[in-house]
Each structure stands twice: as C-alpha cells, then as structure tokens.
C-alpha cells in the first residue's frame, strides 16, 4: 500500500455526502482504490519515470475505472456483509455513475439542455463539470466495465489457473494506461498463464 501514509479528507458538507455512501467512497478513494493504485504506480520501478509521475496526466477510464471497480470488489468480497446501509451506498454509487453515462451522452451527443441534465437527477455543479470535461464522467463506469470484462476474459481463458490476485497485480503493475493497452496486457497475462498450464 505504499511506503508513505495517505491522507483521506472526508467532506463535511452533510448536504453533499450522504452517510450511507461513506464506506463506498472510502473504498474508492483509499484501499483498494486510488491510494492503493497510485502508491503501486509511484513505487513501481519497472515503469518509466514519466509514467510514475503522471507527466501525461491521469487517464480517467483506467484510473477512475479502478476506483469504481474497488467499490464493486469490496461488495463482491463481502465487506458490506453486516452493513446493509453501506451496501446501499455502493449500489447508489453504481447507479449514480450510470446516470453520468446517460447525462454526458445526452449533453454532448443528443444536444440536451442544462435543465434536461439537471432533471435527470444530476446537480447543476456536476452538469457544469460534464460540459467542460466531455467524456470524463462516463469514464468511471466505462473503466470499471472494461476491467470486469478483462477479468472475465482471463478467468474463462485460464480456468482453474486463473488467480484474481495475479490479475489485480497485472493491472496495478501496468499502471494508468489507456484501456486498449490494458487489454493488450491482459492478453499477454493470459498467454503467460497458458504457458504454465
């Protein structure tokens, strides 16, 4: 999880953050989410320095995709087992990211008005963010779905030899890259796994 501690600052605006979404947000932003992911990238000496430092910026679909996948992974791993409120928060988070897909597409491809986006259940400040960052809002779910697709592909290809831990290590060791490169890395992961069979 890195050699240095991370700092997570929780927003105290009660109107902005609902209590039931806290655990999901923590998993997204800390462990197994962004903090864990970025700590791996920064400390991975096999990556070129410019990729460790994020010189070319944060590639949203892979980065935010991992964050949303971390929320999913927490639910899948039973981390909400005794916390129905937390599970509700995770489901709300998934649904919110799905609405983002619709609203961003509506604004940029279907010529929606600002009010149509707000009427779809997205706050005005969020809508303004989507207007100036086309494609960023849907990148969370696009990235998560791609990671799940690649995981399923590797699992089917490798069968009993598939290791979820090794798959996660491959993603984290690859770093923050475009999804096409992550797919190529997954194909290489499968090829290496088949040679072991």
Residue ranges and their predicted role:
Residues 1-197:
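N-terminal maturation segment of proteins
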């Amino acid at each position: 999880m890195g050699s240095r501690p991370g700092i997570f600052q929780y927003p105290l605006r009660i109107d902005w953050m609902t209590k039931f979404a806290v655990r999901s947000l923590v998993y997204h932003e800390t462990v197994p989410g962004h903090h864990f992911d970025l700590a791996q990238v920064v400390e991975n000496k096999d990556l070129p320095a410019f990729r460790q430092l994020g010189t070319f910026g944060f590639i949203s679909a892979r980065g935010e995709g991992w964050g949303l996948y971390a929320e999913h992974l927490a639910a899948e791993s039973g981390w909400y087992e005794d916390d129905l409120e937390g599970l509700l928060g995770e489901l709300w988070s998934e649904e919110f990211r799905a609405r983002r897909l619709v609203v961003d597409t509506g604004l940029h491809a279907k010529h929606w008005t600002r009010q149509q986006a707000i009427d779809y259940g997205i706050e005005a400040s969020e809508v303004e963010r989507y207007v100036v960052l086309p494609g960023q809002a849907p990148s969370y779910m696009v990235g998560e779905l791609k990671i799940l697709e690649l995981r399923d592909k590797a699992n089917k290809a490798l069968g009993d030899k598939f290791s979820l831990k090794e798959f996660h290590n491959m993603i984290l060791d690859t770093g923050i890259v475009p999804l096409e490169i992550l797919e190529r890395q997954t194909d290489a992961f499968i090829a290496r796994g088949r040679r072991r069979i």
